[in-house]
Amino acid sequence: MEARSRIKVAAAVIVQGNKYLVTQRGYGAYKGFWEFPGGKIEAGESAEDAVVREIREELCVAIEVEKRLGTVEYEYPEFHLSMECFVCRIVSGEITLREHDGAQWLHADELNSVSFLNADVEVVKLIQGAGR
């Protein structure tokens, strides 16, 4: 049996007031699904540095990491995803979508109203469990 590829990513749970930023994927096999924005951790890069870089590249804003929320491990059919999640705030810039088809700010009780990627469903559980 062939070893499954393991992808390590960092995700930003961006908070503004009592709302969370969610983005709609604009590419790939999971196009159209919603997620917490972020991306792959590059070799030699910390997860915190990766999430700051990815958000700057994808959304054109600078963020500050407030705290680590947790790690989600999820088995997709094609790969194993290890996603480190951080609670963040935007410190400068205006959101410009460079890779996503949509973005919206949702209250915690509205997070179940969009079709999240499976791993991101687990992030919603972390948010709700943290009482954030």
Question: Language-model segments: which ranges?
Answer:
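Conserved N-terminal beta-strand and adjoining loop/helix that marks the start
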Residues: 1-20, 40
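Nudix hydrolase/Nudix homology domain
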Residues: 29, 34, 96-132
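Active-site-adjacent beta-strand/loop module that shapes the phosphate/pyrophosphate-binding cleft
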Residues: 62, 72-94, 104, 108, ...
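Short secondary-structure boundary/capping segments
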Residues: 4, 12-13, 26, 73, ...
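Beta-strand scaffold of nucleotide-dependent catalytic cores
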Residues: 22-24
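The catalytic Nudix box helix
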Residues: 36-68, 107
